[in-house]
Amino acid sequence: MGYDRLGPSGPSNPNQKDPATSLPELQKKTKTKLILFTLAVLVVGVVCFGIFAGIRAVDSGKTEPKLTRKPTQAISRTCSKSLYPNLCIDTLLDFPGSLTADENELIHISFNATLQKFSKALYTSSTITYTQMPPRVRSAYDSCLELLDDSVDALTRALSSVVVVSGDESHSDVMTWLSSAMTNHDTCTDGFDEIEGQGGEVKDQVIGAVKDLSEMVSNCLAIFAGKVKDLSGVPVVNNRKLLGTEETEELPNWLKREDRELLGTPTSAIQADITVSKDGSGTFKTIAEAIKKAPEHSSRRFVIYVKAGRYEEENLKVGRKKTNLMFIGDGKGKTVITGGKSIADDLTTFHTATFAATGAGFIVRDMTFENYAGPAKHQAVALRVGGDHAVVYRCNIIGYQDALYVHSNRQFFRECEIYGTVDFIFGNAAVILQSCNIYARKPMAQQKITITAQNRKDPNQNTGISIHACKLLATPDLEASKGSYPTYLGRPWKLYSRVVYMMSDMGDHIDPRGWLEWNGPFALDSLYYGEYMNKGLGSGIGQRVKWPGYHVITSTVEASKFTVAQFISGSSWLPSTGVSFFSGLSQ
């Protein structure tokens, strides 16, 4: 299909400057990071981080492992749970102390070895930072460095947590961070796949450095989930009570009282730390200046108020170190962050986002995010979110193909309006969209509209898209010609794609088949697509696809697995916008 994610990227711009973010201190920072990881590993009582045993590459479990030592029974039992048992055995045997370790200790060793391999991949990849690269190659390369760095951070937290893991909430954290690390790896390699025929030695070095990383994380997921059986398959994080019919008007317990007050307070009454105003009446005139000024690793909520206006700045980003940032605008359509970058500008999809947020605790309310590149320029992201515990409340996300990138970690969207054409809600976060309006727009000729493209790659990832109590609508231009442009609920980007629509109102622009193939029979057996108690002219299930992975959900117990409380671990952080929300199925 001409509008596939990895299809034509459009003409390149020979006059465009290198879009890469300068990383002059990356190698120094990487060395510092490795030293810090050594201390972290020592703190949790593992073998000194400086003792690194190279992990031999294997054929993903399809060939006999290259062993010089026989695995212990504990290693054999542990690795029997994994999808890549030969790699698992080799990884554990290569790590000092594994031959005397019990199964619980082997989980820790597996995490540690995987962290070391990611750290080594980051360092190896960073050694070519100053190599001259074409713009698209530089974009893919810089994406990989950022994503590998984020993965090292996620795995460090997972390694520290697995030692003291004691309850459902900690289990969910570990699974989330592992899932995020795998997603980051896949996004890195996908970026190089997008630049077909380019990359050369840069691509070879990076892809070589990240070899086996996804499989190693998969093994960590499998052996950890095997120990925590509640987390296999569709994760049910909180097993203490069923929340299928429970309704709560409470604000989430993961928020401090001050944060709850901020979320429920009118904009005019909020004392912001920074005010952005185009007319110069605030602290800064640009959002970029405000983000730069915000503290790193903040343990308290830092509030940036962006006054009404149209802000077009160069690919704004809230990085991983900018934690607990809250952006408040003057309302949808009033405070507008806009841009027009696309893959036609020699960028990977990851780098096209008008606004991106990867810092944990990111919250935004009452704003519009827009990418105006248009359907002819293919992938063009308006908003990308990859921060854990992210909340997007009362916002517009407006684009065409790939408008909203729910990249990774746990996210919650409430009362938002999302506009797009092809795969316009995509990614591999564990995300719930609740009480949102989802608008299909008129695409280019011959295109089919697909609302979701979820890219869960591994059956143990606790990720997916849950669309709960939303409205699926057509924009006026599509409404006038909807017979020519079928709209589908989604298509499977990766093998274990998972999307559920629950208690939502579907317009008659939804095709009776409901769902669309990605490429022939790919993933039709392994995906999980579900529908539960939807209504509207487009909700009929009589002509829906007959794929093995498609489910008409009739059980409240099954449906409850995709609610706020269970799917994104409401017992620990219950996403909220500061107004009433429902943690179970009831509205």
UniProtKB/Swiss-Prot annotation:
Q: Which regions are flagged for Polar residues bias?
A: 10-19
Compartment(s) of residence: Membrane
Region Pectinesterase inhibitor 61, annotated ranges: 69-223
Site annotation (Transition state stabilizer) points to 401
Q: How does it sit in the membrane?
A: Single-pass membrane protein
Q: Which UniProt keywords apply?
A: Aspartyl esterase, Cell wall biogenesis/degradation, Disulfide bond, Hydrolase, Membrane, Transmembrane, Transmembrane helix
Q: What is this protein called?
A: Probable pectinesterase/pectinesterase inhibitor 61
Q: Which species is listed as the source?
A: Arabidopsis thaliana (Mouse-ear cress)
Gene for this chain: PME61
